């Protein structure tokens, strides 16, 4: 009986630790509505919050969204999860609010590998995303500008040769009409 109680106590005490050790679930793909909202330019670079209108001086930053687009390791092959995320993006880009705009598709990598390798890989991945949107959602190529950023513009600054999933991403920037 004592062994059973001790074993049960260990299992209960270890359950929270085991839960923490599990890999985090992939973040759900943003909805097309969320993407349209994030990528739609605000009028005159102004915003209204609780009745206060804030007008930004100078040029406002272009609306953009950072997406986790999964690729097979070391390749530009889209995973099923990536296609799900890009499905939301493709639907959003066909929305009338965004239909006349052009978009820069920025591919980013982490710092694993040489800078030249990461630059080439990020360019391939940006082109893969643009091609998928063109072929699957009939987004005209003229509306998409794939650009490889390599390991420049890290979301999470890391030393060289550090794998960091949050740095392997695609950023979509609205360039306007």
Task: Please provide the spans of the model-predicted regions.
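N-terminal targeting leaders that direct proteins to extracytoplasmic destinations
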Residues: 1-61
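Secondary-structure boundary/capping positions in well-ordered alpha/beta enzyme cores
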Residues: 18, 100, 140-142
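Glycine-centered loop/turn motifs
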Residues: 30, 74, 160-161
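Extracellular/periplasmic catalytic domains that process cell-envelope and extracellular macromolecules
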Residues: 58-63, 97-98, 163-166
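Acidic/histidine-rich, surface-exposed loop or edge segments in extracytoplasmic proteins
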Residues: 62-74
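Conserved beta-strand core positions
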Residues: 69, 101-103, 144, 170
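Periplasmic peptidoglycan-binding/anchoring modules of Gram-negative envelope and division proteins
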Residues: 71-106, 131-135, 175-177
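Periplasmic OmpA-like peptidoglycan-binding domain that tethers envelope proteins to the cell wall
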Residues: 108-177
């Amino acid at each position: 009986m004592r062994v059973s109680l001790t074993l049960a106590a260990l299992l209960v005490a270890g359950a929270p630790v085991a839960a923490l050790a599990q890999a985090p679930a992939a973040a759900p793909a943003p909805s097309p509505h969320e993407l349209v909202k994030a990528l739609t330019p605000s009028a005159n670079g102004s915003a209204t919050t609780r009745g206060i209108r804030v007008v930004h001086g100078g040029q406002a930053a272009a609306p953009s969204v950072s997406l986790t687009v999964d690729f097979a390791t070391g390749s530009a092959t889209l995973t099923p999860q990536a296609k799900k995320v890009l499905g939301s993006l493709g639907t959003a880009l066909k929305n009338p609010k965004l239909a006349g705009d052009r978009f820069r598709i920025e591919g980013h990598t982490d710092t694993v590998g040489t800078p030249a390798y990461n630059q080439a890989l990020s360019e391939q991945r940006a082109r893969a995303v643009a091609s998928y949107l063109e072929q699957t959602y009939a987004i005209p190529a003229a509306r998409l500008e794939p650009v490889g950023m390599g390991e420049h513009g890290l979301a999470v600054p890391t030393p060289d040769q550090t794998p960091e999933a949050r740095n392997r991403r695609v950023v979509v920037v609205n360039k306007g009409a």
